[in-house]
Amino acid sequence: MVEGMLKTNFRLLFLLIFLLIPTPVLAMHIMEGFLPVKWVIFWDLVTLPFIMVGFIRLQREATQGPGAKLMLAFAGAFIFVLSALKMPSVTGSCSHPTGTGLAAILFGPFITTVLGFIVLIFQALLLAHGGLTTLGANTFSMAVAGPLVAYGVYKGLQKAGINSNFSIFLAAMLGDLVTYIVTSVQLALAFPGSSLFLSALKFMGIFALTQIPLAISEGILTVLTYNFLSRYEDAKIWVEKGEH
């Protein structure tokens, strides 16, 4: 049964967290207090509607069958673990996988927004990654923009008859990369220097050194995890839902 399998994997996932996460010296995407107040408010307001819609859909999804809550928890744990593996990058930020592609494929972008939002709160409060003042900005880049792109790419490729594994890989990879494009724009808007465009390009260029290899790795891992879940009968409900 998938329930026993998922519980076992939860233990392994959280064990990996404590084994692999380095001592946090940088924040999740954008660290606490790094953004000016006007941008804190702006990103909070922009992100709020996605969270509200996501909570409504999450409540509905949680009632769909006995394995729904476990599958949601698995998707959330996947985001938590991958987004906690950090590499230093731009000052005031860092590079890491996002893990949101899998949830976007299985549950859609709005539920993924809520899962990512919850993950960011836990990381800000318990691991000192990110912060409450930058929660809106970080949620928008990782849990709104990334999942929307991942979901759109996956659905578009599936309708075009593209191989499922390649569709999953490209969706997860591009969702990861878009997260950092948006983060670069957020940093450039807050600190434009002499040119907003050049500032954004500068941030993107620095992120690219670490993020492109990470995005490729995340794409591969997402394919492996998706195929792993598809082997279990109780998980097929959500796997097959993602394929239509």
From Swiss-Prot:
The subcellular location is: Cell membrane
**Could you confirm whether the keyword Membrane appears in this record?**
yes
Which Pfam families does the entry link to? CbiM (PF01891)
Membrane-topology annotation of the record: Multi-pass membrane protein
Cite the annotated pathway. Cofactor biosynthesis; adenosylcobalamin biosynthesis
Give me the segments passing through the membrane: 36-56, 65-85, 102-122, 134-154, 168-188, 196-216
GO cellular component terms given for this protein: ATP-binding cassette (ABC) transporter complex
The GO terms describing molecular function are: cobalt ion transmembrane transporter activity
* Family to which this protein belongs: Belongs to the CbiM family.
Assembly and interactions?
Forms an energy-coupling factor (ECF) transporter complex composed of an ATP-binding protein (A component, CbiO), a transmembrane protein (T component, CbiQ) and 2 possible substrate-capture proteins (S components, CbiM and CbiN) of unknown stoichimetry.
Q: What is this protein called?
A: Cobalt transport protein CbiM
State the species of origin: Carboxydothermus hydrogenoformans (strain ATCC BAA-161 / DSM 6008 / Z-2901)
